[in-house]
């Protein structure tokens, strides 16, 4: 690449990891982002999954917004999706079905497509922070395909109710198994952002 980095700095994973909400923790999700990006010539960036993790007895909470660098972020076509963290978590970001494409520049199915897979795993509140309290909305901090649920966003910004327009915090899944994620319109996909 002659010293220049690839333009892609944001994508939706083209495939999940196939085990529901068990992504191998944050490290496993990050590795999946890195692997997918590398396969498409964007491995020259350091990639992080946009996922929050709740606090445990031994670890503080991890906020998705604090894991992904400071922007700007462009999709595989070179279109700006967000200039910075504040822009990303405002109504001014450009995350839509047309821009929230996979690392292969494929459109990710949304409402009206078969199958609809617009539920994108985040475990996050609208401001990109982890949920507090006793309820698990991170599938055991992304290590379980059994217990808990996952908070998801809608990459196409469509669905029923006002929160359905949220790209990162639309509703919780019905469970953490692959089947449970599919039942509400998901496939275990998540967002990946380049931190550099």
Per-range role (PLM):
Residues 1-196:
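Secreted/extracellular ectodomain signature
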